[in-house]
Amino acid sequence: MSWTASVFLRTSTTSMKFLRLRWPLPRIPQNKSANVAPRFRSKSAVSQLSSGFKFVQIRKSTCDSNEMTIKAIKARQIYDSRGNPTVEVDLTTELGLFRAAVPSGASTGVHEALELRDNDKANYHGKSVLKAVGHVNDTLGPELIKANLDVVDQASIDNFMIKLDGTENKSKFGANAILGVSLAVAKAGAAKKGVPLYKHIADLAGNKEIILPVPAFNVINGGSHAGNKLAMQEFMILPTGATSFTEAMKMGSEVYHHLKNVIKAKFGLDATAVGDEGGFAPNIQSNKEALNLISDAIAKAGYTGKIEIGMDVAASEFYKDGQYDLDFKNEKSDKSQWLPADKLANLYQEFIKDFPIVSIEDPFDQDHWEAWSNLTGCTDIQIVGDDLTVTNPKRIATAVEKKACNCLLLKVNQIGTVTESIAAHLLAKKNGWGTMVSHRSGETEDSFIGDLVVGLSTGQIKTGAPCRSERLAKYNQILRIEEEIGAGVKFAGKSFRKPQ
């Protein structure tokens, strides 16, 4: 019997609903719980991050027991959904072991926190993460253990690691090293409090009302996520007409399978291969054709008017010499066909007119501020900043000032800690933006962002198609949360941009 298994056997239950949500997290020992969740005395405080950004959060929740500190931290190299190395962290407290894995992106913004790779071309094409693993095992772990901080105090632990790193973009230890520890700390903090992870996150963010999100299913993949000719990266369906998350999943799944049949009938079985995020990757070049295929599938499923469409253009991937190359995967693309920003904006306006599009992400290059502001100013739909904002408070503040977009794409590995991710969301919300929680194209089985989107109640999440286990891990976690909360739980639906 393993040490971890023996820990589980020695502990007693707190709440079967909690265990269904968080299994196999350790249960609270009898001398701590008496089979009921403990009561907490919470202090609200303003936390100052090293980045200079302030936000109000539940700084510390103290039980009737002593503080629970970290006993051990162990990092290792595992593999993500693309077969590339990534970081996994095990954190041990008196309650047992808490595990977190870090995702990785393909189309990454130049302003993201640094993902530390070994750059040894003889191993994994330079993508191994043994340096980041070493930083956790040799520095971050030992220093955190010596600091003796309570795992419930997420902000203090995250800020401790930020200061220890000492760089603006976490380039000393790597955001992937720091994030692995931060995620594991959040899970340990939830267990110490005897609550599901989403409730702990809600406490950290000061969120009083739980609202389940609309899923944005990426059903056609292009750009850097697929080996086809399609330039624009993601074509998504949003079941905004659903009345529950369960119904939204049903609608998404049915449209996904209708789409497979539509693509198969038009292009043959070979065209139904899937991309990195589980969406189909037919070898088409016309972005409008992708939208037509999705519209046909929605109609065949009987959900016209109940399902809307979103796009992630990832335009930074095909921005060349001040123009946009929609044939960028062709090394011999015709430069005369490249589009200036105003022509590309006109194309988006045509899409919005012809299709039920409610959201466009990264329509222009990450530093093409004027083009962003012009489009956001002349449309009522959601314009999402991903590469533009990279979950970074400084970039968000600039985007707010320039009125460049109206929604933040929240990716925890872009900024590197749970605390800073929450801060980014709160800053966006304060300025009237929406927030869409997001996965990365290189994912793991870790379902953390499923709890994150519920805890923050942002109203929308994108984590791929209803296909591939690393994508379904997040959607399935939200289904479990919906079941645990029970009747009366709110679903964002048509109000996904500003859930209430």
UniProtKB/Swiss-Prot annotation:
<dbReference type="InterPro" id="IPR020809">
    <property type="entry name" value="Enolase_CS"/>
</dbReference>
<comment type="pathway">
    <text>Carbohydrate degradation; glycolysis; pyruvate from D-glyceraldehyde 3-phosphate: step 4/5.</text>
</comment>
<feature type="binding site">
    <location>
        <position position="386"/>
    </location>
    <ligand>
        <name>substrate</name>
    </ligand>
</feature>
<feature type="binding site">
    <location>
        <position position="225"/>
    </location>
    <ligand>
        <name>substrate</name>
    </ligand>
</feature>
<feature type="binding site">
    <location>
        <position position="462"/>
    </location>
    <ligand>
        <name>substrate</name>
    </ligand>
</feature>
<dbReference type="GO" id="GO:0005829">
    <property type="term" value="C:cytosol"/>
</dbReference>
<dbReference type="GO" id="GO:0005886">
    <property type="term" value="C:plasma membrane"/>
</dbReference>
<dbReference type="GO" id="GO:0000287">
    <property type="term" value="F:magnesium ion binding"/>
</dbReference>
<dbReference type="GO" id="GO:0004634">
    <property type="term" value="F:phosphopyruvate hydratase activity"/>
</dbReference>
<feature type="binding site">
    <location>
        <position position="361"/>
    </location>
    <ligand>
        <name>substrate</name>
    </ligand>
</feature>
<comment type="similarity">
    <text>Belongs to the enolase family.</text>
</comment>
<dbReference type="Pfam" id="PF00113">
    <property type="entry name" value="Enolase_C"/>
</dbReference>
<comment type="function">
    <text>Enzyme of the glycolytic pathway. Glycolysis is essential in glial cells but not in neurons; neurons rely on the citric acid cycle for their energy needs, and on lactate and alanine secreted into the hemolymph by glial cells to fuel it.</text>
</comment>
<dbReference type="InterPro" id="IPR020811">
    <property type="entry name" value="Enolase_N"/>
</dbReference>
<feature type="binding site">
    <location>
        <position position="386"/>
    </location>
    <ligand>
        <name>Mg(2+)</name>
    </ligand>
</feature>
<dbReference type="Pfam" id="PF03952">
    <property type="entry name" value="Enolase_N"/>
</dbReference>
<feature type="binding site">
    <location>
        <position position="234"/>
    </location>
    <ligand>
        <name>substrate</name>
    </ligand>
</feature>
<comment type="subunit">
    <text>Homodimer.</text>
</comment>
<dbReference type="GO" id="GO:0005737">
    <property type="term" value="C:cytoplasm"/>
</dbReference>
<dbReference type="GO" id="GO:0061621">
    <property type="term" value="P:canonical glycolysis"/>
</dbReference>
<keyword id="KW-0324">Glycolysis</keyword>
<protein>
    <recommendedName>
        <fullName>Enolase</fullName>
        <ecNumber>4.2.1.11</ecNumber>
    </recommendedName>
</protein>
<keyword id="KW-0479">Metal-binding</keyword>
<feature type="binding site">
    <location>
        <begin position="438"/>
        <end position="441"/>
    </location>
    <ligand>
        <name>substrate</name>
    </ligand>
</feature>
<feature type="active site" description="Proton donor">
    <location>
        <position position="277"/>
    </location>
</feature>
<dbReference type="GO" id="GO:0006096">
    <property type="term" value="P:glycolytic process"/>
</dbReference>
<dbReference type="GO" id="GO:0006094">
    <property type="term" value="P:gluconeogenesis"/>
</dbReference>
<dbReference type="InterPro" id="IPR036849">
    <property type="entry name" value="Enolase-like_C_sf"/>
</dbReference>
<feature type="binding site">
    <location>
        <position position="361"/>
    </location>
    <ligand>
        <name>Mg(2+)</name>
    </ligand>
</feature>
<dbReference type="GO" id="GO:0000015">
    <property type="term" value="C:phosphopyruvate hydratase complex"/>
</dbReference>
<keyword id="KW-0963">Cytoplasm</keyword>
<dbReference type="InterPro" id="IPR029017">
    <property type="entry name" value="Enolase-like_N"/>
</dbReference>
<dbReference type="InterPro" id="IPR020810">
    <property type="entry name" value="Enolase_C"/>
</dbReference>
<keyword id="KW-0456">Lyase</keyword>
<feature type="binding site">
    <location>
        <position position="312"/>
    </location>
    <ligand>
        <name>Mg(2+)</name>
    </ligand>
</feature>
<keyword id="KW-0460">Magnesium</keyword>
<dbReference type="GO" id="GO:0042593">
    <property type="term" value="P:glucose homeostasis"/>
</dbReference>
<feature type="active site" description="Proton acceptor">
    <location>
        <position position="411"/>
    </location>
</feature>
<dbReference type="InterPro" id="IPR000941">
    <property type="entry name" value="Enolase"/>
</dbReference>
